[in-house]
Design a protein with these regions (language model features):
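Glycine-rich, aromatic-flanked loop segments that form ligand/cofactor-binding clefts
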Residues: 1
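Intrinsic-disorder/low-complexity accessory segments
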Residues: 8-17, 22-28, 32, 36-37, ...
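Detector for the c-type heme attachment site
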Residues: 46
Length: 236
């Protein structure tokens, strides 16, 4: 039954709020991200019972088209460290199915739009301290151990791949800026007359994403005699 995920007071899945950023959890998630601009982001979750451990990359046909292939290659390489760590303790796992890397509004993908490498880790729930499963007994402590080992493996990978991860993020910003300069459309002008409150919250959200918006310096008339007035129009 809905809601079926971890929610805040308003029944909102806080892990889907990073684009809209309408709740304290999403807003603070963005603040933390832009404070650090991390090279690697891990979003650790608890999934349905009886499922093996999951780690990124997600389904190869469900990746956002703006996410570079190199991002997915680095994701797979980092995950190979996780696989080795789980192999050592006999924990079963799966990857490249069941989950996607498409929606940028969640923790396991937002950074993919900013030069980070994001990973999702999902541990099957014991629904308590002990659960019998077809593959044996699962204890709550065992689930914690899996997540802890996966975290340590990710840190090990990030250290070993440090120079390449730094280079990837640098190249990502350089390439996207270069591609933007080649676009025929270099900006958008929008009017706020009659919708001041909507405009206020829109501008507020752009600021949360560190997207620069400027007030129009002078009156402007666009094609089709559309008029934009200084003081009530903005360019992004």
């Amino acid at each position: 039954p809905w809601p079926s995920s971890r929610t805040n007071h308003y029944w909102i899945d806080c892990n889907r709020d990073l684009l809209m950023a309408q709740h304290p959890e999403g807003i603070n998630g963005l603040n933390g991200y832009f404070e650090w601009l991390p090279n690697v982001v891990v979003d650790q979750h608890e999934q349905g019972a009886l499922r093996p451990y999951y780690f990124s990359p997600g389904h190869p046909k469900r990746t956002h088209p703006f996410t570079p292939q190199l991002n997915q290659d680095l994701t797979a390489e980092i995950s190979s460290y996780t696989a080795k760590a789980l192999d050592r303790i006999g924990t079963t796992y799966y990857s490249k199915e069941g989950y996607d890397d498409f929606y940028y509004g969640k923790g396991a993908a937002y950074g993919d739009a900013h030069g980070s490498v994001c990973l999702l880790y999902e541990q099957g729930s014991t629904r308590g301290h002990l659960r019998n499963t077809p593959s044996g007994e699962w204890t709550f402590g065992w689930t914690i151990r899996n997540q802890a080992l996966a975290s340590c493996a990710t840190l090990e990978a990030a250290k070993a791949m440090r120079t390449r991860l730094l280079a990837y993020q640098k190249e990502y910003y350089e390439r996207t800026a270069s591609e933007a300069r080649k676009e025929a459309v270099q900006g958008y002008v929008f009017d706020t007359r009659g919708s001041k409150s909507v405009a206020f919250h829109f501008l507020e959200n752009m600021a949360r994403h560190h997207i620069e918006v400027y007030q129009l310096a002078k009156d402007y008339q666009a094609a089709g005699n559309k008029e934009f007035q200084k003081g009530s129009a903005y360019v992004i």
